Amino acid sequence: MAGSTELTIPVTRRATARARVPLPTLLLAALAAPLGAQAPPSPQDVLGHALGERFTDHGQVVRYFDALAAASDLVSVERYGQTGEGRPLLQALIASADSRARLDQILALNAELTDPGTSAARAAEIAATNPAVVYLSYGVHGNESSSSEASMWTAWDLARGAEGLEGALEGAVVVIDPALNPDGRDRYVGWYRQARGANPNPRPEAREHWEPWPGGRFNHYLFDLNRDWSWATQPETRARLATWARWNPQVHVDFHEMSFNSTYFFFPAADPINPAYPEHTHEWGRRFGDGNAAAFDARGWPYYTAESFDLFYPGYGDTWPSLVGAIGMTYEQAGSARAGLAVERTDGVLLTLRDRAQHHRVAGHATIMTAVNGRGELLEGFARFHRDTGADAGDVLLVPGADPSRAAELVGMLQEQGVQVEVAGRAFEANAGAHNGFSARRSFPAGTYRVRARQPRGRLATTLLEPETELNATYSYDVSAWSLPYAFGVEAHTVRGAPAADWTAAPGSTRLMGSVAAGGWTGSGASLARPAFAGESRSFVASSESGPDAPAASASSVGYLVAPGMGAWRGVARLLAAGGRAIALDEGFDAAGRSWPAGTFWIPAYANDDLDGRLASAGLTGAATPVATGSTVNGNDLGTEESYDLSLPRIGLLAGEGVSPTSLGAHWFFLERTLGVPFDQVPADGLGAGALAPYDVLIVPSVTGSGRRTLDGAGDALGAWVRAGGTLVAVSGGASALAELAEVERVQDEEDDDEEEDEGDDDDLEDALLGREARELERWEQSVPGTIFELSLDPAHPLAFGAGVSSAGDGDADKLFVLHSGDLAFMPDEEFESAAYFPAELAELSGVISEENLESLEQRAWLVSRRMGAGKVILFADDPLFRHFWFGAFQPYANAVLLGPAY
């Protein structure tokens, strides 16, 4: 509170940081309550304004929860992580004195309910006395801003025993996460405070209702955190999932906002609904909906259910919790970024921030009380969910293959979500069905991973690993496919029974994705100090023939060989940044007792002083194989001219208005936190010859209409820069916008020509007479909503180095699995190279696509490289970094950025 004296309060066990509360607030509270019975402070007491009068930034939210914990024995606050910008992530536990006294026992019994081996009788015994765990998550989209306001209101209500919550804490312990995305929230709140006048303007045309790019929806790295639950790429998600097994909630609510002209949405969900959910999940979705409806009806508030917001894609804040046993639900309040503090709807109703927070508050109350009133049934159903896990599903075997780092990365992603993984201590045989092949008796090597279907996170594991998830509707809110073995390029099989193979728990796997610690690179240029990496003592292992036991280089060694892969690229980038030298060999060969693929890195001794020290600093020691001679058994010798002398390119990444925020964020995060290379974000509105001159590589993420116009306007400058030696790498919408510059014809250009020739066809009349549902289905199918395909790869092309995998273990590493969305593909031409393309007789592996779109993709290019003067343009039909989880597509992208200037 401005002008007030503040008192620093020592924090007790109920809060993990120091809380600053205005002195007048404390004095008034102390006078109003007898010693030892201090009334919990309201948000207004601590913040100095009533909820809804102004936006509360995250620092103020933290201050309120700390003050509440300091004043109430029922509330404790824990910092469970921090955001990309260093803001704390909070979990507030609100529980009765009795529940607090036996909290460890409550949570242990709750965890026992997740064990598939817990009997129905034992579950009933636990359910008779244990409270339910209700987890309320607010503000995963930072500009859906009423959520965090409602979190404070709800916490205060629980702490003071507000009317309507009688008995709530006897039947439940409540966990409140007041802001899942503090960085996005403060981006929005900070802008709004600057944009509004002395009083809020409710006219929707006013500036304060038009949030600028990139918006507060996203986190620091511009990721949509409500798509990240199942991939755990972002620090906020990873920190939250690390706490999940402590709580194992029976109920999880994800509070959102939608169009300010809408009403309020709560469950039951719309179709499609993931088939992994048992009737327990559906039944309780309806029961919570009934409870919310009664609360809203009593107040005359409008709402709707089951019309939108499905429960299919596993990365949502309702779907993922539901896959691990909670009744996960999305609640959507009218409002969002355009609502501000007050907005006039098209029906003339004035919608205020306080209204929006109040609706979330009441929905939260109703949800808690529905859980409390049905506590016993809820807990027994929770136990049954886990007891029946794996009843109809087989276990999944993951084969490490030629590049074990792929399987290790996949295992790390699963383990981070609490999935148990085992590893075979010896080779074995089993009857197994290949995910993209047929069933047969097969041999599997030692080191094969097994993911059991019957385990606490079994339904989640099955959903993430199965080759295709059944879609029970004609439309999905998001992508229609995601199978992780395809995403990582890992051979996968389904097996029933338990083949003997000396199975043990797989060791924890350090993920490559996002593991570069923040605070390293500060700009472009190879002279900068390298960034700090998490787990520096651990070298990655790139192939089964190399590892930490590989012999040290002898005095006569000519250097080291490193097989291509993502871990190799990161290590080589470190080496180059530190002044070392590496060479990429253009063809495969045999040396040092094994075969090496095209794209293998040679780290020559003659060009690297203190070679072993350089390898250790780059994290390459465990992956490097020493070679004592430059001669090879088969193929070119190491000194061949068929090679590429590498240097770390100066990289620019297009950013700003017109660039897709999430696409930009994926590239930013990949370059900074996964690959660990320096780069500059280049303002889109300043493209020109001068702006491009400092760079060897310019990356163009997906763009919107205004971004396309920006690129069109900069066409001459971009063309001149490429012809002078620049490498232009563009993906998805950015590639579509730059195809004309590269003189690459898009498939849709050909189709547009065909449509002009067919204008007036009878089919147009039939299309015009389609019913509404048929139109919606056709529109969705035409969009290609995230469908998995197997592409043919040119393994000799530099863009394909290290990227190819075999199909169903056939041994030929000439395939690439991609998640294709939209209608972009390129017409092959002799004037440029097609490094990856859709084959003839194309069929989707997983997901939805119309027959017409399927045929239009056959024998069309997905990844092309076009030489222009001394430079080149590289175009990807999709964004290979989409949501930063399609690991198999990272390699061709890294090749484009780091090898592109050299080949």
Give, region by region, the residue ranges found by the protein language model.
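Aromatic- and acidic-residue-enriched carbohydrate-binding clefts of CAZyme catalytic domains
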Residues: 203-223, 764
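Short, solvent-exposed turn/loop segments enriched in Gly/Ser/Thr/Pro and often Arg
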Residues: 177-182, 192, 255-262, 734-735
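Short, conserved secondary-structure transition motifs
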Residues: 169-188, 785
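Conserved beta-strand positions
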Residues: 254-255, 700
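Bacterial N-terminal signal peptides
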Residues: 22-34
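Intrinsic-disorder/low-complexity accessory segments
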Residues: 38-145, 149-173, 221, 227, ...
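Aromatic- and acidic-residue-enriched segments that line the glycan-binding/catalytic groove
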Residues: 186-202
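N-terminal secretory signal peptides that target proteins for export/translocation
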Residues: 1-20
